[in-house]
C-alpha cells in the first residue's frame, strides 16, 4: 500500500489483482442487493410497477452524474476514488438495512456505481499498458460476469431464507470491497487541478464528448459498446416474456438460468478476445457483433430447452469477444486525449442512454401486442444490421 508507484506492466501485479478483487466484490454486492431489495419490497407490499423503478434510478444516476464522475476519477488517485464509491454503496446498503426507504438507499448505491465505473476502467490503463490492456479488460469483464452470476443467485437464495440477513450480507460484501481498495497502489492523479465549478465541469465533459466523437476510433468504440449494453439489458427483459410463450415454462427461475448461459458465454468470449485481439486488430471483433444479432434471431424461434441454452451460450461468447477489445480501445485512446476517467464517463452516458432508448422501443412493441418471438427476431435483425453498418462506416472513415 505504498503512496506512490510507477505503472507495473505485469498483468498479475498486486495492484491489478486488488482491482479485480474489489470489482468482483462490488459487482457481487450490486446484484445481490438488487434481488434482496426486491424481496424486501415484496415483503412490504410495494406495488409490482415500483420494482423496475429501482433499475431506472440506478441507470438514471449514471446519466445525471455523467458530466462529473469522469473528472472526479481523473482528479484523484483512482484507487481512492474506487474506495469512496464503494463507501457510498456501503452507505446505501446500510440505509436499507436500517429501514430507510429502499429507493433512497438504492439511489445512493447507483451514485456510488456511477462514480466507481470511470475509475475502475481508467485505472487499468495506469496499471498496465499496450496489448496487456486487452487482457486486463478480459479479467475485469470475467470477474464482473462471475460476480453477476454468483451475486444474483446469492441475493435470491438468501432473501428466500431471511431478507434482513441478505441485506446485511450485501453491506458486508461492500465493506470487503472497500478493504480491497486499500491494496490498490496510490498512483498520481491523471488530471489534477481542474475546476470544480458547475459550468466549467459540464463544459469540460461535453468538450470530452466532442473530442471522442470526432476521433474515428473512439467514436467507433462508443457506438459499439452502447449498442451492446443497450441490447443486453433489453434481452434480459425479453427472456422473461419469451420463456412462457416459446417453451411453455412459467417458472420465474428459467429466465435466470438462460441469462446465466449468456453470462458464462461472455466469460469465454472475453478470454478468447484477450488472446486473439490486440489494439491494432480491434476490427476482428466486429463479425462477432453481427453474429450476436443472428444468434438472437435463431434463439427467438426455438421451442425446446437444449437448443435455447446452446444458442444463448454462443451468443454470450460472441458478446464477450465483441465488447472487450472495444473497451480497451476506448481506454487507451481516451487516456491520451481526454483522460481515461472522462472517456469512461462519456461511455457510460452513451451506454445508459442506449439502454433507456432500447427498453423504450421494446416496451412500445410489447404494449402494442407484438408477439415475443417476433420481437426477438426483429430485435436481432436490427442489432445485426446496426453493427454491420457501424463496421462499414468505421472502415470508410
Curated annotation (Swiss-Prot):
GO cellular component: plasma membrane
Superkingdom: Bacteria
Subcellular location field: Cell inner membrane
Keyword Iron carried by entry: no
Primary subcellular site in the record, as a coarse category: membrane
Pfam families: MFS_1
Recorded GO MF terms: lysophospholipid:sodium symporter activity
Sequence intervals crossing the membrane: 16-36, 53-73, 91-111, 139-159, 164-184, 227-247, 253-273, 281-301, 305-325, 352-372, 373-393
Keyword Cell division included in the entry's annotation: no
Keywords: Cell inner membrane, Cell membrane, Lipid transport, Membrane, Transmembrane, Transmembrane helix, Transport
Membrane topology per record: Multi-pass membrane protein
Similarity section: Belongs to the major facilitator superfamily. LplT (TC 2.A.1.42) family.
HAMAP family in the record: MFS_LplT
NCBIfam families in alphabetical order: PRK11195.1
Entry function: Catalyzes the facilitated diffusion of 2-acyl-glycero-3-phosphoethanolamine (2-acyl-GPE) into the cell.
Entry protein name: Lysophospholipid transporter LplT
Organism: Klebsiella pneumoniae (strain 342)
